[in-house]
């Protein structure tokens, strides 16, 4: 029993080992097969990826090749175009040179023809001169025979007539010299005035009756006019200024004789253009705001002016009236600038004579104060100025200076005389005041017209603001003696036909040039 059991156990062990071996072998075979399959799959995927990379590399290479080829073709094309342009320029330059060569050949031929014509004309002129000399000699002989006068006797008669004419001119010139000598008798006073003028110089503002407002574009003109013109009518009604909207690009012209109103309208219109909202209510608001700004500017101008001159304790109302003079002009001269200039000049003159400099400056600054409001109150600016100075309790010397600076009242102090002198200096210095532009231009044109009406005058120029006329004559027609006679004749016509202040200098210029070239 034990033997059978052992044998059975051994057989079972052997069978189990065999079954285990077979099972393990199958498992191993299966793993090997799976591993081979995985390996084959990996190899296949590697081949596919390698093929894809190969194709991608080929595509990139083709793209690079195409890009390089395109760039090369563009470069070649640009170079061809540049070469073509250079070739065209060379061809054009060659054509220009050919045309210039043809032109030069034509000019050379023309010059040769002209030279030949000039030679023939010179020969003809020489023949004519010879005939003229013979004719003049025969005419002189015939005149001597007819008039029963020799050449010397006729010459004596002509010289006597010229001598009489010159005697008249000499008498006139002598009288003018005497007048100038009398004017030179005040040399010392002129030296003092000249010193004062040299120590002070003021700028000058030209008179104008228009202002210009720049616009961002021409479409703004339609907005300024408004529907049926209501905006422009509102602005003109509120300011009293005419708005001129014409073909001037991006600009509107404001026209009016009251500078304060014109400045108010200018500020209001600039604010409206900047704001963009333009309608009657907004216009009224901006005009009122601009009026306040102008009033503030007037006040600040008065304060700054008194500070600049060094005047203290001036009444605030008088200071504001002083600021209004910034917007007044007289013959092209700004009244405030003129008053500042008179104040400085009066102070300098007072310092030279040992008078009160501060009081002289105060009187000079306020001498034209009436001009600030003379269009609002009846009476001359002198009367209004005296009334204002009295109202605000100014110094009696200041009041007398205002009253007497135009000679309406007798001056009772040295300072009043100095203020009148400074006023005359400021108004009379060259460039301070101007006449009407139209009259000024007409006078200059008449000067040149008179000068150019004489035979032998080549050109004339009115210079120094019409205080001198320079006449350039043709030297072959006007000799030196004729130049003096021409200057006298033009001077007489100017005196007879023109009205002008001061003197006009007549200068005749005769120039002869002889030019030779050494080779």
Curated annotation (Swiss-Prot):
EC number: 3.1.-.-
Protein's UniProt keywords contain Plastid: no
Subcellular localization, as worded in the UniProt entry: Cell membrane
InterPro entries the record matches: HD/PDEase_dom (IPR003607), HD_domain (IPR006674), HDIG_dom (IPR006675), KH_dom (IPR004087), KH_dom_type_1 (IPR004088), KH_dom_type_1_sf (IPR036612), Ribonuclease_Y (IPR017705), RNase_Y_N (IPR022711)
Family: Belongs to the RNase Y family.
Function: Endoribonuclease that initiates mRNA decay.
Name this polypeptide is given: Ribonuclease Y
Organism: Lysinibacillus sphaericus (strain C3-41)
Lineage: Bacteria, Bacillati, Bacillota, Bacilli, Bacillales
